[in-house]
Amino acid sequence: MDLLNTTFLSIGLAIDAFAVSLSSGFIIKHIKFNKALKIALFFGIFQGVMPLIGWLTGLTFRDALANFDHWIAFILLAAIGGKMIYEACQDEEENKKFNPLDNYTLFALAIATSIDALAAGLGLSVLRVSILLACTLIASITFSLSFIGVFIGHKFGSIFNQKLEILGGITLIGIGTKILVEGLIIH
């Protein structure tokens, strides 16, 4: 696999993290550099490490993991998205809002959006590719798109000033559904 194809793979893998970063930016009231950096680091690191884990796992466990990876991603994203929608429909005083900066939430989102990167790593294990270059490129592109996505999402959240948390929840459920459908079609 050449550098151009690895770059396209990296962009494709980063799209889910970018979409979640947009949703996070909608929700964050007072955006600061360090908040966007935290989100981007979570997504960038997970997207960069998961292909390495997949590559190391190799063909031995590929079939076993492939049978349920899409379900894991769907359940995590649907649960988080559903929670966002539920909380957006509650009174702010009665309900602590969904916090995309919470470490546990970011961990779950990073895992859910990087399942496809794990699968990509499994695929890369059968190709002649520099896994370190691929992981570095995937992490860098995901980090960059996620960082920018937080600010873009925040800008649109400020302009519309509506319950965009619902849109964020729908986005997460949509991403989870896409991953599930793709996984079911492939298997």
From Swiss-Prot:
Q: Supply one GO molecular-function term.
A: manganese ion transmembrane transporter activity
The record's InterPro entries line, in alphabetical order, gives: Mntp/YtaF, Put_MntP
The portions of this protein that span the membrane are 8-28, 39-59, 65-85, 106-126, 131-151, 166-186
* Cellular component GO terms held in the UniProt record: plasma membrane
Protein's membrane topology: Multi-pass membrane protein
The keyword Plastid is annotated on this UniProt entry: no
Superkingdom, natural source? Bacteria
Which compartments does it reside in? Cell inner membrane
Q: Chief localization class?
A: membrane
List the keywords (alphabetical): Cell inner membrane, Cell membrane, Ion transport, Manganese, Membrane, Transmembrane, Transmembrane helix, Transport
Q: Any idea what job this protein has?
A: Probably functions as a manganese efflux pump.
Similarity comment: family membership? Belongs to the MntP (TC 9.B.29) family.
Q: What is this protein called?
A: Putative manganese efflux pump MntP
